[in-house]
Amino acid sequence: MQRSLKWFASTTTVAMLFVLIGGALVTKTDSGMGCGRSWPLCHGQWIPDDITPQLVIELSHRLVSGLAAIMVLILCIRSWRVMGHVRETKPLAVLSFVFLVLQSLIGAAAVVWGQSDFVMALHFGISLISFAAVLLLTLLIFVVDKKFSPTSLQLDGQMRFHIYGIIIYSYLVVYTGALVRHTNASLACPSWPLCAKSRLLPVQFHEWVQMGHRLAAAVIIIWIAVATVHAARYYREQPVIYYGWIISLLLVLAQMVTGALVVFTELNLYISLAHAFFISCLFGVLSYLLLLALRTRRRPATAAGRSVEDTASAPLK
């Protein structure tokens, strides 16, 4: 595998991460209209006359997104040519580019015509799918060259249930978090983990949005913890699964801590961006576990108290 392709794939993955964080920055700083109702230009000008912080943030996000789109397109073409024989290459290439274009169109439509908060909450999730596809494509590039090549795996039905269920549910959690941001409900509840110390239940829309996200987040934390315990009991001999869940648990706990700190610090910008960063990384790890699950054969359920048998090493094909 060409070394240049590895470097380019890694750089493209980082660029996509900047797109995600940049989008969160635009939302957190309320810079979505920094360029007015003009797209792709700012206020209909190549070089705007009145430079404001919101304009700089919005324009920078557009430039980074445009550059990332070009890089993703090049990566798709190169990976298609070099490793088109790998069955996941073409679907991942299509997903990465199509969803990146889709999120750009939604962003442009929001600027020019405006969109509801419920539609705009999809924006981050769509970008997240594109990021995950690029990340998996990058990992495949290294795997094909027999680096980062995991052992051949056998997953029982319970582990498959955790992998499939958690990644689908995590997307719901991402949507509720994005809805919190777009409805300006981040500080609707001044207390944590309850909405207010004086009462148990929310009483108005923004509080329900905030508490709905907290409840969804609590469920995924517990679910990932359960999956991690299962991996620790039966998959220690398969490090890619065992450590994948350990990392997922650490990331979701970091997500919980930064979520609480967002409330306690009253929307500190750096903590808010860290919150977006951790969920992006978590979704990436879960996506890799999904890829592994789709590639592996099923094995009989593990008997209680027994560990998974060692399996022979084999490169992914």
Curated annotation (Swiss-Prot):
One of its GO terms (biological process) is heme A biosynthetic process. The N-half (TM1-TM4) and C-half (TM5-TM8) domains are connected by an intracellular loop. Each domain is formed from four-helix bundles and they align in a pseudo twofold symmetry manner. The N-half domain is the substrate-heme O binding domain and the C-half domain is the cofactor heme B binding domain. Heme b binds at residues 213, 275. It is a multi-pass membrane protein. Its EC number is 1.17.99.9. It is found in: Cell membrane. The active site is at 58. Keywords: Cell membrane, Disulfide bond, Heme biosynthesis, Iron, Membrane, Metal-binding, Oxidoreductase, Transmembrane, Transmembrane helix. This is Heme A synthase.
